[in-house]
Amino acid sequence: MRILAVDDDRAVRESLRRSLSFNGYSVELANDGVEALEMVARDRPDALVLDVMMPRLDGLEVCRQLRSTGDDLPILVLTARDSVSERVAGLDAGADDYLPKPFALEELLARIRALLRRTKPDDAAESVAMSFSDLTLDPVTREVARGQRWISLTRTEFALLEMLIANPRRVLTRSRILEEVWGFDFPTSGNALEVYVGYLRRKTEADGESRLIHTVRGVGYVLRETPP
C-alpha cells in the first residue's frame, strides 16, 4: 500500500516516512498542498496523510479540491488544533478522519488501517440492493437513492448508511457504530459520528423527505419510519 504523507515540517515528514515504512507501507512525501495535488494527479496513492496548516495551500483546501472532482481518495488529516470546530471543519472539507498532534504511532497506524479497510471491495457482498422505506443502497455499485433521487455519498457516509440499513429498526449503540464504521474505538469526546449522521440526514432529506435516521438519546441511532 502506498501512502502520501504531506507536511511542511521536514522532521514530521521524515518521522512519518520512517514509521510507516517500518510497518510495511511504501511512503512518498510532499512539502505542501500544491505539491500533494500534483503528486496525486501524477500517481494516485492508496491513502493521504495530510497536515492542515501548510504554506501555499493548506490541508483543508487540498481535501476540498480532491472531493470537488469526485476523488474519494482516503484522507487522514493531522492537526495541531483539537477543538470541536476544527475537527468539524476537517470533516466538512472532505477528510475521512482526523488525528490531533501530538499522536501515538499506534493510533496513527490503526486509523490508516481502518481507512484502507473501508476502501477494499467486499468480495462476499450481496449483489441485491438493500432497501428501507423509499431508501435504497447497492453495496456493489455503491449507488444510493431516495425514491427516484440519486444521492452521492462519501466513503464514510456510505459505510454508516450501509450499517443502518442492514439493521432496520434496531437501535445501534454509538460504540458499536464507531467500532464497525471507523474500525476502532473513538474517544468518547469525539463527535465524528454526530457530524456524519448530520451529513446523512441532510442528504437523505434534501427534497423534504421524512426523517429515517433517528437519535436514541444516550444510546445511539436507529433507522425507522417514525421517531422512537
From Swiss-Prot:
Phosphorylated and dephosphorylated by MprB. It is found in: Cytoplasm. Residues 127-225 bind DNA. GO terms for biological process: regulation of DNA-templated transcription. One of its GO terms (cellular component) is cytosol. SUPFAM superfamilies: CheY-like. Keywords: Cytoplasm, DNA-binding, Phosphoprotein, Stress response, Transcription, Transcription regulation, Two-component regulatory system, Virulence. One of its GO terms (molecular function) is phosphorelay response regulator activity. The modification 4-aspartylphosphate is found at D46. Residues 2-116 form the Response regulatory domain. The keyword Transcription regulation applies. Member of the two-component regulatory system MprB/MprA which contributes to maintaining a balance among several systems involved in stress resistance and is required for establishment and maintenance of persistent infection in the host. Functions as a transcriptional regulator that recognizes a 19-bp nucleotide motif comprizing two loosely conserved 8-bp direct DNA-binding motif repeats separated by a 3-bp spacer region. This is Response regulator MprA. It comes from Mycobacterium leprae (strain TN). The lineage of its organism: Bacteria, Bacillati, Actinomycetota, Actinomycetes, Mycobacteriales.
